[in-house]
Amino acid sequence: MSELLVYKASAGSGKTFTLAVEYIKLLIFNPRAYRQILAVTFTNKATAEMKERILSQLYGIQIGDKDSEAYLNRIKEETGKTEQEIREAAGIALSYMLHDYSRFRVETIDSFFQSVMRNLARELELSPNLNIELNNTEVLSDAVDSMIEKLGPTSPVLAWLLDYINERIADDKRWNVSDEVKSFGRNIFDEGYIEKGEGLRQRLRNPNTIKEYRKQLKALETEILEQMKGFYDQFEGELDGHALTADDLKNGSRGIGSYFRKLNNGVLSNDIRNATVEKCLEDAKHWATKTSPRYADIINLANSSLIQILEDAEKLRSKNNLLLNSCRLSLQHLNKVQLLANIDEEVRQLNHDNNRFLLSDTNALLHQLVKDGDSSFVFEKIGTNIHNVMIDEFQDTSRMQWGNFKLLLLEGLSQGADSLIVGDVKQSIYRWRNGDWGILNSLNDHIEHFPIRVKTLATNRRSETNVIRFNNRIFTAAANYLNGVYKQQLGKDCEDLQKAYADVVQESPRSTEKGYVKVSFLEPDEEH
């Protein structure tokens, strides 16, 4: 059965070498296989480097160049072909590719999806004269300027803008209206917003939507605070019924009474569960001082009711703290949501008026088409001759991109062709353009019913031994420390973190201990 091969490749581990070997192996079996392979990466520079690497190594293998010996040996080992067979096939493949270069598809993710869009333009009812806009910033700037120009004294947008400005002033932040709104408006290009944008715009067409939602959030906030205040009332009621006060308990006002007072004041954060609370949950003896004249009464009361009240409060406190914070954050940002939806609407209107299509909308449009439509139709337009898919820097792939690629991968796998993914979650740096390392981290044994085989490239050939050893120790320690913090707060290991750093330790091919690492500790200052 065909499989998806996943290479986890840390820095210096031979990722480009491995990709080129896997590509050339397909050509050795079939010199025209390049017509059925799609290799994608993130930058034009990486695309050019990959093309150059494949072509130069094909030539090197053909003529017996020493620089291509490592490629030849790996291909011999993994294909079972003789050296002569590999050299001949490499020469034939190189000749075919040079005379059929347009079908040698190593390209960026963006350029691939653009080509798909061109093939689907008619079905998507996109005008043939449509202007493709590459610069989101310029479009956003025009939209915000247009929105501000339209503001009138009674405009709800003006009220939202004023709220936004007041919030910035309260936080001692810059409040240049135009620049700040443009900066905030970049959120409309985030995939999280794009996926929910249409539903949000539909709901906000009702002018009462935000008002009703605000009312619901306020009611939930009040309900949570009253519920937690109820535990303080129970605690005080039990003490009062036995002629006791919180000062009679162990450590007086600094003891367990402090916990319940915080609940009464609406403080539900995790740090109020301190050592005193832990001890009082464990044993009634921690509720009273041994020298207290009411020692026996307090112990009996703790066993009969106070410990139970504390346990009940703790069962709800953590969950209610999350709900309370969610309510308050939502209330804080409701006006921003309205403002964002208005900016989005203005961008769409300007695009329509100027017969313009944003390049950044490509992924979203294809994602919607693939999700709602007939995938076989999409494959027909893309070109069903793509069998093998190779994706480089996969840790920076976005959810929408993965949704689009996944169907292409599954189509190739169903035809008996293997596909390849290369990435390293520890090097994910493209969150600003919706990259999601969690996709690679969550690829386990199967994709649908097709098996996934994971290989880790563990040898770092780029760095010196001392540098490798330092990195092994520092990142192992850092991952363990963060997992400890996570476990302390949530009571369980952070499985995503553990999985991401399970392969952090690299090996060195060198026996000599060379390399130098210097660590400097910086003191925090007002700016940082």
Can you say where each PLM-predicted feature lies in the sequence?
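Conserved SF1/SF2 helicase motif Ia
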Residues: L27-F42, S414
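Walker A/P-loop NTP-binding motif
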Residues: T18-R32, L409-E411, I447
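Conserved helicase NTPase motor core
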Residues: L4-K8, L38-A39, A46-T47, R105, ...
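Conserved ATP-dependent motor core of P-loop NTPases, especially the RecA-like helicase ATPase domain
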Residues: S2, Y7, T41-F42, L58, ...
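Conserved Walker A/P-loop ATP-binding site and its immediately adjacent core
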Residues: I37-I54, I109-D110
